[in-house]
Amino acid sequence: MIEFCVGSYEDSLKVSQLGAKQIELNSALSLGGLSPSLSVLKRIKKETDLIVNCMVRPRAAGFFYSKYEKQIIFDEAKLFLENGADGIVFGFLNEDGTIDTLSTKDMVSFIHSYQKTAIFHRAFDCTSNPFEAMETLIDCGVDRVLTSGQMPTASEGKDCLKGLNQRYGEQIQILMGSGVNAQNASELMAYTGIKNIHSSCLGIKEDPTTTTSKVSFSYLKGNGYESMNLEKVKELLNV
């Protein structure tokens, strides 16, 4: 299974037209992905047959949330589930880097009440012990976990990924992501035994109104912003 990490309505339509079957829908990919717009989800579900898993993440940085942030996370999950989301992508950690078991169990139960998929995101890669964390997620009833093996890229984390899959691959679906592309996907799948991959296939688009002689809204070099590179998508779909 290939899941594409998508940050816009336009990119969702384009990857669907290329033959993609599943996406993780976000906004603000430059921040690691935040909750998407409800209107984007509704249009995608109306106009494509994509399986759409929606991120619920209210802010940048880490995953130790206040009670106010948790209220918003659950409110957003409800809105997405009521409007066609096939799964919810979330992550709750305690201050010490362990899984926030209570919030995770509550979210899994809520998602499963809609008979949808509960997916723990790369907050997993910030946990203090990946094997203990995986056991906790299994005990909480999580269906799938996205991970790079606690390294910046899956290639760097391949030994951890292999170990996790050998120990837990029959109990929870492991989705391998971060830096996975057409050039390394086959090798990584063979080495780790993980057959499910997650990729953003990022490219850069230019917006000439980003910068003037006096004002700049640039956050990348020049006037660019993240968008999917469709050639990379095609290559990965052909692996």
Regions found by a protein language model. Name each.
Residues 39-44, 50-104:
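Glycine/small-residue-rich loop that forms an oxyanion/phosphate-binding "nest" at active or ligand-binding sites
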